[in-house]
Amino acid sequence: MCLKPSPTDDNPNREIPHNPCINAGAMMTMSMVYPEYNRNARLAKIMQVWKDLSGGDDAPIGYDDPTYKSESGSADRNWCLGYMMKGSGAFPPCFTTLDDTLELYFQVCSILNTNDGMAIMASTLANGGLNPLTGKRIFSADHVRNVLPIMLSSGMYDYSGQWAYDVGVPAKSGVGGCVFFVVPNVCGISIWSPRLDEVGNSTRGTEPPPSANPHPSYRAYHTHCTSISAYLLLDITQRC
């Protein structure tokens, strides 16, 4: 579960998950999102953030009820994790109930977006939290700076380490078949292909980046590269 010891004066055994790209960390995140509102209002606010990230109020953000029912109906492991976290005092003071937290988590797992929308979302992260199409600031640059390392280290399930080695840019995949990745200050890219590999990533979505990368100079680890490729000159608002 990757609980990290975080003792307090009143709970010296407190442990909390710090990685939002694993189930326990995602559930912890849900417990802290708009806790002052009821669950429906919390979901509406989260979906509005998705719209802002994906191009504004006209972005086709939706919600898939069958996915929600599937997530909710096969969640024994998540309930187990939730009770373990609750038992260790992991949840913050703003925590409402485990039922609210997990149901919101299942609902957020059921949000729908288009591939174009995911590319705009990735471009917003590449642009430091400023949507390149609408000009609206969604996240602060500091928040984006904190998000991208987590995406690089954990965004691709058990393939994350190999992805970081082969491709070297922050990315996030989902079991719906989407992979979106962020080249900071350059562009955001989204690939959707629903066939999954053995670890839950899109089979085709994990293939193109290495072969589509004509020059590695944008990668943080290629400090020996001095030339700048045409890839670096891509307009962040450009669509393929």
Set out the residue ranges of the language-model regions:
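Short, mixed-charge aromatic SLiMs
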Residues: 1-10, 50-59, 109, 142-158, ...
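Active-site-adjacent helix/loop patches that line small-molecule binding or acyl-intermediate pockets
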Residues: 1-108, 116-119
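Short glycine/serine- and small hydrophobic-enriched flexible loop segments
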Residues: 31-35, 123-127, 214
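Glycine-rich, acidic and aromatic/proline-enriched surface loops and short helix-turn segments
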Residues: 83-91, 124-127, 153-156
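Active-site-proximal binding-pocket segments
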Residues: 94-96, 112, 119, 123-134
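Short, conserved, surface-exposed binding loops centered on an aromatic residue
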Residues: 110-113, 139
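Structured C-terminal helix/loop/strand segments within mature extracytoplasmic catalytic/sensor domains
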Residues: 126-240
